[in-house]
Amino acid sequence: SEMCIRDRYRFAKWGKIKIGQALQLKKIPQRVFSPYLNEIDEDEYLTILNNLLMTKRKSVHAENEFELTNKLVRFALSRGFEMKDIRHCITLSDENDNLE
């Protein structure tokens, strides 16, 4: 299950929540895969999420910043990322936009 977790977040770009749900569907007990989810490198995980959000931001059409943020949050949640990580990446992205 460790390799499955790595593949899902590196290649399929899934978040921890969606990976956990997929493993539970395969009847793998949470006590087996939970330690591996906790071992995911936080920096790499946030980089993947940030890249996903930047790519999605380019393709999303929104009338204002509020609508854009909502669409990005819904997209990231559907990929299984946690709200705290999504908010962190969106805040960083907004700060970078303001610097330019």
Indicate where each model-derived feature is located.
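An alpha-helical, amphipathic repeat domain used for nucleic-acid recognition
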Residues: 1-100
